[in-house]
Swiss-Prot record:
Lineage, highest ranks first: Bacteria, Bacillati, Cyanobacteriota, Cyanophyceae, Nostocales
Protein name stated in the entry: Triosephosphate isomerase
Subunit structure: Homodimer.
Top enzyme category: isomerase
Pathway assigned in UniProt: Carbohydrate biosynthesis; gluconeogenesis; Carbohydrate degradation; glycolysis; D-glyceraldehyde 3-phosphate from glycerone phosphate: step 1/1
Keyword Transcription regulation applies: no
Gene name of the encoded protein: tpiA
Length: 243
């Protein structure tokens, strides 16, 4: 059965003090959250230990924004699976467009990170999506098919979340129409061997469009950027209303 998965990606925002302030405003709203919704926070690495202690026993699961494919070694600036699990992490974002764009992530390295996440008992959130140029050229479907084909080699689809993030809609304020996002996510699902993989939409998700997004039959959740940084905003998204 497909789960509703709502993840907040904090990117490079929030100090430990700001994280504690966020939680004070956000946690009370979880009393209103319907059962069966997986809520994940993916903070910077420096906030993981603080969140792990504070969130213990709560509805929120802890996620990370990256994982290296080696268990240990001379990889300056990276973090390993054992380090994440020791910090209480259960989910990890892999292949986000910003990692691909700014840090040279490829489908091959994405696959290595996915395998490693699963090897250490983590559930990876695989991000796929197209740029505006690729979309305008009519390459969306073929590009995503290629990302899935290369990224999912030897990956257990029983322990996987996928996020469709049209790159042209990330941080731009421009949102993919909900019906179009639903169509693309349906195409993604058709390429999977497991029809019960939860597939999220990510790209300028906000309180004023969450209900329409989650009304789409193929969409199982959202990967939220900027709107996850404010307690009231993220709470409204987590507690979306089905229409």
């Amino acid at each position: 059965m497909r789960k509703i998965v709502i993840a907040g990606n904090w990117k490079m925002f929030k100090t430990q003090a700001e994280t504690q302030e966020f939680l004070q405003g956000f946690l009370p709203h979880l009393e209103e959250t319907p059962q069966g919704r997986e809520v994940i926070l993916c903070p910077p690495f420096t906030d993981l230990s603080v969140l792990s202690k504070t969130l213990h026993g709560s509805l929120i699961q802890l996620g990370a924004q990256n994982i290296h494919w080696e268990e240990f070694g001379a990889y300056t600036g990276e973090i390993s699976g054992p380090m994440l699990t020791e910090s209480g992490v259960r989910f990890v974002i892999v292949g986000h467009s910003e990692r691909r764009q700014y840090f040279g992530e490829t489908d091959a390295t994405v696959n290595l990170r996915l395998r490693t996440a699963q090897r250490f008992g983590l559930t990876p959130i695989l991000c796929v999506g197209e740029t505006k140029q690729q979309r305008d050229a009519g390459e969306t479907e073929s590009l995503i098919a290629l990302q899935l084909d290369k990224g999912l080699v030897d990956i257990d689809q029983n322990n996987l979340v996928i996020a469709y993030e049209p790159i042209w809609a990330i941080g731009t304020g421009e949102t993919c129409e909900a019906v179009e996002a639903n169509r693309i996510i349906g195409l993604i699902r058709s390429q999977l061997s497991n029809p019960n993989v939860s597939i999220q939409y990510g790209g300028s998700v906000k309180p004023n469009n969450i209900d329409e997004i989650m009304a789409q039959p193929e969409i199982d959740g959202v990967l939220v950027g900027g709107a996850s940084l404010e307690p009231e905003s993220f709470a409204r998204i987590v507690n979306f209303h089905l229409v």
